[in-house]
Regions:
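Carbohydrate-binding surfaces of carbohydrate-active enzymes
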Residues: 15-27, 32-448
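N-terminal low-complexity segments that are often proline-rich with Ser/Thr-Pro
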Residues: 450-452
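Catalytic and substrate-binding clefts that recognize carbohydrates or anionic sugar/phosphate headgroups
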Residues: 1-19
Length: 452
């Protein structure tokens, strides 16, 4: 089906504008591809689902279908395995096909998914796994509201931006796109646009795709998630000044590389085990998502420099080199398992054991006891062994001292909301700071810095 879609769309464009591919036509933008079903209480099915499931996991899904709704039988295992199959079918039959077409035609595959739904798995089993197959991974950030708390927020959603930034770091992608400002309203100001844009750039975005620029706002068009980036907006004649700011920022934050020493594993495969739309059981995975969101937001607000880790990306790009945990183009000295990490996939577990044996540092806030959704005494024993892992208390506030860096440190007053982005180049570093709420003082300690 994807091949036919490409034939009817991109090949048609290629006939008329193929000479501009890779130049005037730099890429292909996709908007919210997903595997959601129309009935929220149904499950996604495809004609060869049961064959694909058996080939992947070695048993028949049919007698276990009830486990996708009810907590009967090996329901954690079945739900985990089912979401894993959906993810791989989506990757193999859509993402990899689109990626390959763009590679052949010098295009950047970009756009975004339904990344704000996490931890709801109905639309997409793993956001980061999708980003690994885009030449320019992307997200969207809508509205004019800043919300640090909700896993489903847009601006303020640390997880959403860290996912795309981390996947890009690990796969060697330089540019990260954000479809920004849709639905911010006709009354949005240039100050709002700068405030929101600066925040997402501090988290890793460096290619802004403004929503939207229609030729006309006649009729229903004026209600299509305004504002418009056209002369219809009252600040249009001044908009160039703001664009110059983001152009300079895009260049600076695309130069060199961001090399974070801490990898925080995202508990996506753990949430697979509990995912159901059967109320009230869905409250459990929603709570897991909210707690993880709170944890990584606390890390970011304490200026901990970290990437997020997808177990699918680790499967395809993970290794251990000395005391470094390798994920593609990045090497980490510390791996963090959040309290919500009840499951680790077999490949992840094997790498973590090798990492610990080589002297790598593992910080564990929880007690993973499942591997691929199956209870594992071996995993439970490993993660409880103080000689293998550093235990941390999830009930206590995040202790930034666990993640202290010898390269940079911040001394901040209570109540701070400072975000930063640091990039290294051959001849120095770039540090971008964004402060969101008032602080009584801010003091930065770094080595051999120039301030501009």
């Amino acid at each position: 089906m994807t091949d036919k879609f490409i034939e009817l769309t991109l090949d048609g464009y290629k006939q008329t504008a193929g000479g501009e591919f890779g130049g005037l036509v730099p890429g292909w933008f996709t908007d919210e591809p997903q595997v959601v079903v129309t009935d929220r209480h149904a499950i996604r099915w495809t004609p060869d689902l049961f064959d694909a499931f058996r080939a992947r996991w070695g048993y028949d899904l049919t007698p276990h279908l009830v486990s996708l709704w009810e907590e009967v039988g090996p329901w954690r295992q079945v739900r985990h395995n089912y979401r894993d199959v959906l993810m791989n079918l989506f990757l193999d039959r859509f993402m990899k096909v689109c990626h390959a077409y763009c590679e052949r035609n010098e295009l950047a595959f970009t756009g975004h998914f339904w990344e704000h739904g996490w931890p709801d798995m109905a639309h997409n089993p793993d956001n980061m796994a999708m980003y690994a197959w885009q030449q320019m991974p992307g997200i969207d950030l809508l509205y004019n509201k800043f919300d640090l708390d909700s896993p489903n927020a847009h601006f303020g959603n640390v997880r959403s931006v860290k996912e795309v930034n981390s996947a890009a770091n690990q796969t060697g992608r330089v540019r990260k796109l954000s479809e920004s400002y849709g639905g911010a309203g006709w009354d949005v100001t240039l100050r709002d646009l700068k405030r929101l844009g600066d925040w997402e750039y501090a988290l890793g975005v460096n290619f802004m795709n403004q929503h939207i620029a229609p030729l006309s706002i006649a009729g229903a068009r004026k209600y299509d998630y305004p504002p418009t980036f056209t002369p219809h907006s009252p600040w249009w004649e001044y908009y160039r000044e703001l664009n110059m700011h983001f152009a300079r920022l895009s260049l600076a934050l695309s130069s060199g590389g961001q090399y974070n020493d801490v990898l925080v594993l995202e508990p996506t495969t753990s949430i697979w085990m509990y995912y159901t739309q059967h109320a009230p059981r869905r409250n459990h995975w929603r709570t897991m998502g909210a707690q993880f969101q709170e944890f990584i937001t606390a890390l970011e607000r304490q200026q901990v420099e970290f990437d997020l880790g997808s177990e699918n990306i680790i499967l395809n790009h993970g290794s251990v080199r000395g005391d470094r945990f390798i994920v593609g183009k990045r090497a980490y000295g510390t791996v963090v398992l959040p309290a919500q990490m009840e499951n680790v996939d077999a490949a992840t577990f094997a790498l973590l054991r090798r990492f610990a044996a080589k002297g790598g540092r593992i910080i564990c806030y929880g007690a993973p006891r499942y591997v691929d959704g199956v209870p594992s005494a071996e995993a439970e024993s490993f993660f409880a062994d103080a000689a293998q892992v550093t235990r941390a208390d999830a009930s206590e506030p995040v202790d930034a001292a666990l993640y202290a860096s010898s390269e940079i440190a911040f001394d901040l007053a209570q109540g701070n909301c400072l975000f930063h982005h640091r990039r290294r180049m051959d001849d120095g570093q770039v540090l971008f700071l964004v402060i969101y709420f008032a602080v009584s003082y801010t003091h930065l300690r770094a080595h051999e810095t120039d301030q501009y």
